[in-house]
Every structure is written in C-alpha cells, then in structure tokens.
Amino acid sequence: MQLTHLNKQNNPTMVDVSDKHITTREAYASGVISMSEQAFESAINHTGKKGPITQTAIIAAIMGSKKTSEIIPMCHPLMINKINVDITPNPAEHSITLGVLVKCEGKTGVEMEALTGVSIGLLTIYDMLKAIDKSMVISDIALQSKSGGKSGDFVREDS
C-alpha cells in the first residue's frame, strides 16, 4: 500500500480530494491525564490559580480541533459542523478522560481534528495544573470511532 501523502518522487504532497464525494463524516477520540490527588481535586473543584480548568480545557479542545489544518501539515481545512467535548473525572485513579466528537459534511475525514482536540484539551489541563503536579501523565490518546467516507466505519474494539 502506498502512502497517500507521498508523490511518485517520494516527496510530501497534500492529497487531492477533488473527485471524492461529500458525505457526513464523524470521529470520536479520547485520552487520559493522570495526576496527583491534590491536582485532581483542584481540577474538579475549580480551585486552580489559572481559573476553571475543565471549562478551559473544553474551549481549548474546540479551538484545537478547529485549527488542525494549521498545525498538521497535510490536513485539509474543513468546514466543521459540530464539536462536542466531554470530560469524565475518574476519582479512584485521580485522572480525567477527555473525549472529542467532530462532525462535518465533506470530502475528507475528521479523525485528525478529533485527535488534535483531545491532545490540546489534555495539554491545557497539564498547563493549568503544572504548578501543583509536574509529574502528570497524558496517555491513551486514540481514535475510538469514525464514520463516513470511502474507508467506511471504524470502532475501536477495546472501547
């Protein structure tokens, strides 16, 4: 299988989507940030010095999804119809799971937008809590599902 972002001369190229059909595209990705009990309590109780941590992470995830084509070199700019961010606190593990759903009507998928949104949202949590806990760990960033397009649907088996 040939990589789609390389031309015949093996140089980087942006995929031509001119002949693709416009379809509804949707992708959901998630990731986890683990932290100390003190950092977790600060995040959940909104007592961080930098403001409301989870709400800021939601806004950052939305912004990250919208800016994907500006920071990932071969991503096409997309007209995004919907971005939904969910945050799930996991008190027993002192962790937060952040998920991003992105939807559009377009010629190319929104997987990268969902993954970028998750990454930026989790990095924002790290930034806002690093004064409390520099040992936080961001992990398990993964595409959980996607629908639409030529390659069909995908659902992660372990999700």
Curated annotation (Swiss-Prot):
Substrate binds at M74, C75, H76, M112, E113. CDD domains: MoaC_PE. Belongs to the MoaC family. Pfam families: MoaC. NCBIfam families: moaC, PRK09364.1. Homohexamer; trimer of dimers. GO terms for biological process: Mo-molybdopterin cofactor biosynthetic process. This is Cyclic pyranopterin monophosphate synthase. Catalyzes the conversion of (8S)-3',8-cyclo-7,8-dihydroguanosine 5'-triphosphate to cyclic pyranopterin monophosphate (cPMP). It catalyses: (8S)-3',8-cyclo-7,8-dihydroguanosine 5'-triphosphate = cyclic pyranopterin phosphate + diphosphate. The keyword Oxidoreductase does not apply. Pathway: Cofactor biosynthesis; molybdopterin biosynthesis. Coiled coil: none annotated. Its EC number is 4.6.1.17. GO terms for molecular function: cyclic pyranopterin monophosphate synthase activity.
